[in-house]
């Protein structure tokens, strides 16, 4: 399993958002129990496994930053047709069984009505709240995409510079504060494998006790993993920003955020104000969930999230 909440795979190319026809309560007339069904499925999985939040956060991020939030990441590859899942950095994305279960239940109650893209959005939102994060509304009405091509996946690694990150987020209208909220918010839960932060283990600026701990943890076989948030690894809170200030960031991008003059004050604001962080993270998630969405007659409503209808 690769890094559970690898939001550090910052994107290179993003498409403009399409906001038309998305609205709160989109399914009130066609499938009233849609959001409650998804919420119940998510809770049942989260109650057994608290890493569900990290898994769904990563899933939504990796889906939305590649040609928009259209559930293209959910398509299974075949021998004749590879998909976004075929790309190495998507190999560790998990939680698909949660989406499958919700979709199966929804098809029994409201056939061909609720999109897989909306299920991912609702499920991620609910998992964040379960992990102590902000509760927020999301607009629905997304359609599922008709394309899932490995060549569309343009992802950078965890050593990306702040300047590169700012440029990428700016291309879709995200400001610096929103970027910091998304990166830190994604890293407040989940793990990173040792191969992804070898540069940090060698960094003398890292907290010496943590560096010694990481060296010991990474001696094991099969690329061991460690929590990115060493103090509250299953809670969506502002603790990750406190650790950045204390030179305890696991990933290079997180350490860069506190060292770069354009983001340092934002990290500090979030570190000492959990309410501010939660509000900013909720707003960032709402905005990210509307990147490049398909609405109206575009795309389709899949009956199986892992395969196109035709």
UniProtKB/Swiss-Prot annotation:
Its EC number is 1.11.1.7. It is an enzyme of class 1 (oxidoreductase). Ca(2+) 1 binds at residues 63, 66, 68, 70, 72. Pfam families: peroxidase. It is found in: Secreted. One of its GO terms (biological process) is hydrogen peroxide catabolic process. Its cofactor is heme b; Ca(2+). Heme b binds at residue 187. Residues 1-20 form the signal peptide. Its main location: secreted. It catalyses: 2 a phenolic donor + H2O2 = 2 a phenolic radical donor + 2 H2O. Disulfide bonds join 31-110, 64-69, 116-305, 194-218. Removal of H(2)O(2), oxidation of toxic reductants, biosynthesis and degradation of lignin, suberization, auxin catabolism, response to environmental stresses such as wounding, pathogen attack and oxidative stress. These functions might be dependent on each isozyme/isoform in each plant tissue. There are 73 peroxidase genes in A.thaliana. This is Peroxidase 8. It comes from Arabidopsis thaliana (Mouse-ear cress). The gene is PER8.
């Amino acid at each position: 399993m690769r890094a559970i909440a690898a939001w550090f795979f910052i994107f290179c190319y993003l498409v403009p958002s399409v906001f038309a026809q998305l609205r709160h309560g989109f399914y009130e007339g066609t499938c009233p129990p849609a959001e409650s069904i998804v919420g119940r499925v998510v809770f049942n999985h989260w109650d057994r496994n608290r890493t569900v939040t990290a898994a769904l956060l990563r899933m939504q991020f990796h889906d939305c930053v590649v040609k928009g939030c259209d559930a293209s990441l959910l398509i299974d590859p075949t021998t004749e047709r590879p998909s976004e899942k075929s790309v190495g950095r998507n190999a560790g994305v998990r939680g698909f069984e949660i989406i499958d279960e919700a979709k199966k239940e929804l098809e029994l109650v409201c056939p061909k009505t609720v999109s897989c893209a909306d299920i991912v959005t609702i499920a991620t939102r609910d998992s964040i709240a379960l992990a102590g994060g902000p509760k927020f509304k999301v607009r629905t009405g997304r359609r599922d995409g008709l394309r899932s091509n490995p060549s569309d996946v343009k992802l950078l690694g965890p050593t990306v510079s702040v300047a590169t990150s700012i440029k990428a987020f700016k291309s879709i209208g995200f400001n610096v504060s929103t970027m910091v909220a998304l990166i830190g918010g994604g890293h407040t839960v989940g793990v990173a494998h040792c191969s992804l932060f070898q540069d940090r283990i060698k960094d003398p600026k890292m907290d010496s006790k943590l560096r010694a701990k990481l060296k010991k943890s990474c001696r094991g076989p099969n690329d061991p993993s460690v929590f990115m948030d060493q103090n509250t690894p299953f809670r969506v809170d502002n603790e990750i920003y406190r650790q950045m200030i204390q030179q305890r960031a696991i990933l290079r991008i997180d350490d860069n955020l506190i060292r770069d003059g354009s983001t340092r004050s934002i990290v500090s604001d979030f570190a000492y104000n959990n309410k501010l962080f939660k509000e900013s993270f909720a707003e960032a998630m709402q905005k990210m969930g509307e990147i490049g969405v398909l609405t109206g007659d575009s795309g389709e409503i899949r009956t199986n999230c892992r395969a196109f209808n035709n």
